[in-house]
Amino acid sequence: MDEEWTPRTELGRLVANGEIKTISEALHSKLPLKEYQIVDYLIPDLKDEVINIERAQRMTDSGRRMNYSITAVVGNGNGYVGVGRGKAKEAAPAIKKAIDNAKLNIIEIKRGCGSWECGCGKPHTLPFLVNGKSGSVSVTLKPAPQGVGLAVGDVVKVILRMAGIDDAWGFAAGHTKTTVNYALATFDALKKTVSIKINPKINLSTPIYVGGIGNAGSNKD
């Protein structure tokens, strides 16, 4: 968290003034998230990890110039995760841009025990099957019983771990060696845990958890 953060947006001012106290409140405020410091302020235990580094050389009149393109993921391991990209002429600024953009892209996911083989009721896996796509890559994530672990690719594993998902099955199609699209397709799948609506009249056998585990409860949004 930057020590001398001066909010520049309405959402930032509401957070700094204590009128919005949680990241969940911020994301549901319908105000745009344009300051990464808001996320730092509301999720002090946020972690970040670089998952892809691309280097490209180009020739200029003054010689060869290197450009960096970075993909990073942030999360608190408890229902919140973001993926972002950053570009710069040097690695360090590109990494910072990627992490800051990941914070601006942060989402609140749903978790639960969606595996019929388990039924423990804990938020260890996905609440239901979700699909995501980016470019040529498509990703499918399925709920798994407790103890299975993350039976997914390495890139997906980092993102799910950051989101707070401990068990999942997954498979991908397309050019998964393109790490950026692989990561974005996974992120797109996690967004579906939020966008897919569940009929409130359905009596679920296990609860669905929204965001942090303190928000456990019903299937209603």
UniProtKB/Swiss-Prot annotation:
Could you tell me the superkingdom of the organism this chain comes from? Archaea
Q: Which UniProt keywords apply?
A: Ribonucleoprotein, Ribosomal protein, RNA-binding, rRNA-binding
SUPFAM superfamilies reported in the protein's UniProt record: dsRNA-binding domain-like (SSF54768), Ribosomal protein S5 domain 2-like (SSF54211)
Q: Name one GO molecular function term.
A: rRNA binding
Matching entries from InterPro entries are given as: Ribosomal_Su5_D2-typ_SF (IPR020568), Ribosomal_uS5 (IPR000851), Ribosomal_uS5_arc (IPR047866), Ribosomal_uS5_C (IPR005324), Ribosomal_uS5_euk/arc (IPR005711), Ribosomal_uS5_N (IPR013810), Ribosomal_uS5_N_CS (IPR018192), Ribsml_uS5_D2-typ_fold_subgr (IPR014721)
Q: Name one GO cellular component term.
A: cytosolic small ribosomal subunit
Coiled coil stretches, renumbered = none
An example of a Gene Ontology BP annotation on this entry?
translation
Domain S5 DRBM, residue spans:
46-109
Recorded domain comment: The N-terminal domain interacts with the head of the 30S subunit; the C-terminal domain interacts with the body and contacts protein S4. The interaction surface between S4 and S5 is involved in control of translational fidelity.
According to the record's subunit comment, the protein's assembly and interactions are:
Part of the 30S ribosomal subunit. Contacts protein S4.
What role does it play? With S4 and S12 plays an important role in translational accuracy.
Which PANTHER family does the annotation name? 40S RIBOSOMAL PROTEIN S2, RIBOSOMAL S SUBUNIT
Q: Which family does it belong to?
A: Belongs to the universal ribosomal protein uS5 family.
Query: What is this protein identified as?
Result: Small ribosomal subunit protein uS5
